[in-house]
Amino acid sequence: VKLYLVRHASASDVAPSDADRELTKEGREESRILGAALRKAGTKPEQILTSPLLRARQTADIIARELNFPDEVTACDELLNDHPLDKLLRAVKAKETILVGHMPSLAEHLAGLLGSTNPAAFSMGKASVACVELATLRLGQGELRWFLRQKQLRLLTS
């Protein structure tokens, strides 16, 4: 099983509520670059799950478009902050899944997948992605295949 943990791209700080923060122009471009880099890497997700917050949904939709993803992107409350990893893993129904969410939960999830007790070591900048491979969807059993920040993603697609 391959999981791609993605932090949403840059979003506006001005919105009626945190849930309504939209991607900025830069954030839309970051998402496009992220999707293009995943396409170049041969990523073929069978499932894309996203936090229901607008900035994450927009990030996921742009990535899906870049990957010519044929299905719907699915909103998943388990990708909101403060939801346990075991519940998120129950939502994963495919061998290759993109998960779009938020800090600090993404770092906590990444640490949990890899069997680390130090989530601070996995701090993810906006529009970054980590690929974890697991034989089975079990905590602490993952192997980090790669972790790319936006600057590296830009180099891959230029």
Which residues make up each language-model segment?
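Acidic/His metal-coordination segments adjacent to aromatic residues that form catalytic metal sites
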Residues: L88
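A glycine-rich beta-strand to alpha-helix segment
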Residues: E96-A111
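Short, glycine/serine-rich, charged loops/turns that create anion-binding
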Residues: S10, L53, P104, T136, ...
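Domain-level recognition of soluble alpha/beta enzyme cores
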Residues: T117-E143, R149-Q150
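Residue-level signal for well-ordered alpha-helical positions
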Residues: I62-I63, G112-L113, A135
